[in-house]
Every structure is written in C-alpha cells, then in structure tokens.
C-alpha cells in the first residue's frame, strides 16, 4: 500500500471518532483541546472580509464551519480533504449548523489543488502538514493565493536534531509503536511515515522564503511537556512580485 492509499484508509477508519481522538491526543501531549487549538489558529489569522478561504485537509470541517458561523463576513469558504468519509462527517455538521450555503467541500489532494491560480485570499491548514510533502504544499498554496493573500498553518514542529538519521529512525519507531498500541496498524504506519515531513521553525522559514512568501511569522505555542515537540503557528503573505520556486 502506498502512502496516499494508507492515509486515505487511516482517516476513513478514523472519521467517525476523529475529533474525540485528536482532542485526547492534543490534551495528552500538548495540554490543548482540539477546539482550543483550532480557535487559536483562527484568532491568530487575519480573516479577510468578503474574501475567499480555502482550508486544506479540512477533515470534519471544523475551520470552515467555525469561520462561516461566527460572523467573519467572508464571501465563501472551501474545504478540501483527500478522504470522502471525513467530508461526509463535515457535511452532516454543516446541515446541523444550517450553514450549507456558505461552504463548498471538495475531495482532492493538497498536493494538486483543483482550483485556478489566484483564487483565494486565505489558505489555512491545521494538524495536517506532517502528512504532506511540504515543498509541494507551499508551492500549491502559493499558486492558488491572490497577491497579498495569506497562508496560515498550525502543526507540530520538529527540532534540528530530527535531521540526524539515527534520531529520525528512533522517532519513527516510537511513533509506530505508540500508535500501534493506541490505534491500529494503518495509523501506526501513517504517523511513523509523517516524521520525515515534520519541520523545525527555521526550516519552515527557509522553505516559505524559497517559495516566495514574505512577512513570515512563526510562533511556538506552549507544550505540556518539554520533551514533546512544540506546536507551531505559521503565517506568511504571498508577495506582489516574484513567484513560487
């Protein structure tokens, strides 16, 4: 099974209990609730009035639903996810919240975003970049953003020690064993494979600059334990000149 197929299978199985599981994991390692973490990202993000927003790896639609139902005045919110069952959960939540008209959902990969160049004023992504090829994610985000548009990300951040092959190997083993015992074999493979995609604050800054983003701001949030990698909130603006490398 390739990585993409395993991710889809993993989150298909996880979809009915996704928010409960992620809430428990964030609380266990970072001391955050899932709702609190997402709300922090939204509050830290300049939401463009009458703008178009794209939420990558939208999952059960928490970000689009929160933005659409809290009077931010955006024109449209789009949620993209690679897993149909996650989007099905999002649609059910949209119906119960009576906000179906404000949100569009699409099943697709953030590695190949099915929108034209310069479509959105804001692109968001929470707790998912570690399952993606980061350079491709940034390039695609740049492509679909309007000039002056904002990219806003929240996810786990690594340290420079993670670059060392032996450290990376040990982290993969630790992730595999932990999720094998707490979840299942597919989740174990997915999270072990994600270790290579975790970037440090410095690496994020370099990659954003290489892609052509400006006004880069990366904030480390507090973690429950010192030995646990800290979460990062990452924001950057698409410059009015230049282009994705």
Regions found by a protein language model. Give the residues of each.
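A short glycine-rich, Lys/Arg-flanked "PGG" loop and its adjoining helix->strand segment in the class I
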Residues: 136-147
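Core SAM-dependent methyltransferase catalytic element
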Residues: 211-214, 220-245
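A short acidic, Gly/Pro-enriched loop at the edge of an enzyme's catalytic core
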Residues: 111-123
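Conserved class I S-adenosyl-L-methionine
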Residues: 1-47, 66
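Conserved beta-strand signature within the Rossmann-like core of class I S-adenosyl-L-methionine
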Residues: 149-156
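Class I SAM-dependent methyltransferase SAM/SAH-binding core
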Residues: 54-56, 60-112
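C-terminal alpha-helical "lid/dimerization" subdomain adjacent to the S-adenosyl-L-methionine
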Residues: 156-211, 216-224
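A short SAM/SAH-binding and catalytic strip from SAM-dependent methyltransferases
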Residues: 122-135
